[in-house]
Amino acid sequence: MADQTASAEVATEKMDTAEAPAAAPAASAAAPAEAESNENTTVPSNVLSANGGQQTGNQSAPRNTSTVPTRQYLDSTVVPILLQGLGALAKDRPENPIEFLANFLLREKDRYNAENQNPAGQQ
C-alpha cells in the first residue's frame, strides 16, 4: 500500500510540473474571436461602450481601433504612459506602489492623450 501511495504522489508531481503549451491554444482561440468581431461591427443596444455609455461626437474612432491588432492598439495608447509610470515607480519605490502608479496615470493622462490623438492606423 505504501508503494501505491508513493507512485500516486510521483504521478501527481509529474502532472503538476508538466508544462502546458501556452501559445497554441491561445492563438487558436483568439483567431475565431477576431474573425467574429470583424464580421459584426454593430454593438447591441444593451452593451455599454468603453466610455461608460456616454455618446461622443466621433463614433467612427472606436470602430477604427477595434480593427487594429491588440498589440498595436496597446503600444499606441497605454504602453508609453505605463513605461514612464513603472520607471517612476522603480525609481521612487513608494510604500504603496499601486496607489503611486494610479496617481501617476491620472496625473499624466492628459499629456499622453494629447500625444495619442491619431488612432494607431492613421499615422
Curated annotation (Swiss-Prot):
Residues 1-73 are annotated as: Disordered. Residues 38-73 have a biased composition (Polar residues). This is Dosage compensation protein dpy-30. GO terms for cellular component: nucleus. It comes from Caenorhabditis elegans. Disruption phenotype: RNAi-mediated knockdown suppresses the growth delay and elevated body fat index of the TOR complex 2 mutant rict-1. Results in disruption of the invariant transdifferentiation of the Y rectal cell to the PDA motor neuron. Residues 18-35 have a biased composition (Low complexity). Component of the SET2 complex (also known as the SET1/COMPASS complex), which contains at least set-2, swd-2.1, cfp-1, rbbp-5, wdr-5.1, dpy-30 and ash-2. Within the complex, interacts with cfp-1 and wdr-5.1. Interacts with jmjd-3.1. InterPro entries: Dpy-30_motif, DPY30_SDC1_DD. GO terms for biological process: dosage compensation by hypoactivation of X chromosome; locomotion; nematode male tail tip morphogenesis; regulation of multicellular organism growth; transdifferentiation.
